[in-house]
Amino acid sequence: MRSVGLIPNIQKDQVAEITSRMYKILSEHDIDVYLTHEGADLIGTESAGVSSDVMGEVAEMIIILGGDGTILKAAREYAPYDIPLLGINLGKMGFLAEIEANEVMAYLESLLTGNYTIEERMMLDATVLRDRKEITTFSALNDVIIAKGPFSRIIEVETKVGGNYLETYPGDGLIVTSPTGSTGYSFSAGGPIISSNLEVMMITPICPHLMHNRSVIISSDEVVTAKMKTNYAVVVLTVDGQQGFTLQDGDEIKVKKSNYKTKLVKLRRRSFYQLLNEKLTGGQEV
């Protein structure tokens, strides 16, 4: 490995110390280290700061120091560059991070010697059509969410799968999630958890009315079409909980499997189910 990008979330505790230490060790091993401009300013190495475009072109791996939100942002931003991402958890839950902040030094040798594997995660593409014209497209690692605005009024979302009518969901909205996103908002909305090595999509209604409260798991080869049937409420499309777009009555959102994949660096021999146990129960048998 000849070059590494470091993306620290400068709002997190300990981030300056850990970033500085990693920069020093990687540089001592003759690895070219690039940082975001704000990351470079944080540790006083302004000359190492580059734009995201440059980092995508020169880095062979990107190390992210932050929480799941920081990793999600990097996954979308660097998906076109096909670069493996290593997450170091400085947040709370950390489903996407591979190691915790206090484990960095223990696993650094494995990273330097190439003793790791790469796990690919399916991503989603969401396209908004207005008057049958495409007006914007987003990529997501976790989920695409259609949700009502601040007022307590039910919205209706007509949903089709592969062009076939499925259901018109009355409620607070709809979630289309990847397996990776099944442990996020969809899980909180009552959806099941899907193993991360599967390539499927899941549709989960948000606070649905009466008998509409079941998730539907579909093939990743299908296209989900969700159409707004509401003209009296603010409805927003949210991508990975980070990007938003205001929808209008009659807008269609088409969600499908993306051509991009997120590549996650795996340093630990830990199955998805072991990770699940650690995050949900603290690693205890209950």
Swiss-Prot record:
InterPro entries: ATP-NAD_kinase_N, ATP-NAD_kinase_PpnK-typ_C, NAD/diacylglycerol_kinase_sf, NADK
Cell compartment(s), UniProt: Cytoplasm
GO terms assigned for molecular function: ATP binding; metal ion binding; NAD binding; NAD+ kinase activity
The protein, known as: NAD kinase
An example Gene Ontology CC term for this record: cytoplasm
Family: Belongs to the NAD kinase family.
Cofactor or coenzyme needed: a divalent metal cation
Enzyme Commission number(s) of this protein: 2.7.1.23
EC top class named in words: transferase
UniProt key word Ribosomal protein: no
Function recorded in the entry: Involved in the regulation of the intracellular balance of NAD and NADP, and is a key enzyme in the biosynthesis of NADP. Catalyzes specifically the phosphorylation on 2'-hydroxyl of the adenosine moiety of NAD to yield NADP.
Active site: D68 (proton acceptor)
Pfam families linked to this entry: NAD_kinase (PF01513), NAD_kinase_C (PF20143)
PANTHER family, A to Z: NAD KINASE
Protein residues bound to NAD(+): D68, G69, K73, N142, D143, R153, D172, T183, G184, Y185, S186, F187, S188, Q242
Primary residence: cytoplasm
UniProt record, GO biological process: NAD metabolic process; NADP biosynthetic process
Keywords: ATP-binding, Cytoplasm, Kinase, NAD, NADP, Nucleotide-binding, Transferase
